[in-house]
Amino acid sequence: MLDLTPTELERYRRQMMLPGFDEDAQRRLKSFTALVTGVGGLGGTAALYLAVAGIGKLILVRGGELRLDDMNRQVLMTHDTVGQPRVFKAKETLEKINPDVEVEAVFDYITPDNVDHLVRSTDITLDCAHNFAERDLLNEACVRYRKPMVEAAMDGMEAYLTTILPGQTGCLTCLFPEKPEWDRRGFAVVGAVSGTLACLAALEAIKLITGFEKPLVSELLTMNLGRLEFAKRRIYRDPHCPVCGNHAPWRQHVSRSLESQLRDLDVDRIFNLSRPI
């Protein structure tokens, strides 16, 4: 693992006071790359808290320009960037907040053409995409390459969160075999709601990477933040799931080259840090 500089030791001193969160945990954070999609009120805020916690590298993925009605929940943006690509301003802001974190900005949406490369370039994914088309692509790629994915979504005052470990838990398609209706521009949102969920998503990633607390594995956390009601329910892997099931198409058509790449992935380094329930 990478060593910590004197500046980093001082910067992260307060979180290293937590039981189980020692210098080794901090070095693990520094050695990890996280892919964050969306880079809005959810993804942008999650990226912020990963950056200040000391993640080694962030890959931010979001196409499109910033709109004025986005600004009620944007913590990385300023008014003068309305009409410009949000992902570059997010990179600039994060690098100013913590210059020790490497930030890569990808001005694009998640597509079939880029998803494999992006997922293979990272250790963990935070799925904060704004529609199920992108979420499904991320889910399939994370399962294919056995990369952990923190899944977070909200609409109005309601939100859900879970952590997906391919090979150990169900995937997003197990959870939502039929996709809910999702209006990408029409959903209601209060910035404090997306921000609350984003903080929990970032914390899930930090727990999974460092192992200092048990992550939300094989459970779905649902929240109604208007009434402050929280519930957990067990989720299961569907053996007939078309994405992660025993007979998923990618299992039957994987090439020898890809099989070799999968064996070379340092999956155990990630999975052994979690303690599945």
UniProtKB/Swiss-Prot annotation:
One GO-annotated biological process of the protein: nitrogen fixation
Gene Ontology molecular function: nucleotidyltransferase activity; thiosulfate-cyanide sulfurtransferase activity; ubiquitin-like modifier activating enzyme activity
Record-given protein name: Protein HesA
Species per Swiss-Prot/TrEMBL record: Leptolyngbya boryana (Plectonema boryanum)
Keyword Plastid part of the UniProt annotation: no
Swiss-Prot/TrEMBL keywords: Nitrogen fixation
InterPro entries, alphabetized: ThiF/MoeB/HesA (IPR045886), ThiF_NAD_FAD-bd (IPR000594), Ubiquitin-activating_enz (IPR035985)
Cellular component terms (Gene Ontology): cytoplasm
Gene (UniProt): hesA
Keyword check for NADP: no
Source species, domain of life: Bacteria
Family: Belongs to the HesA/MoeB/ThiF family.
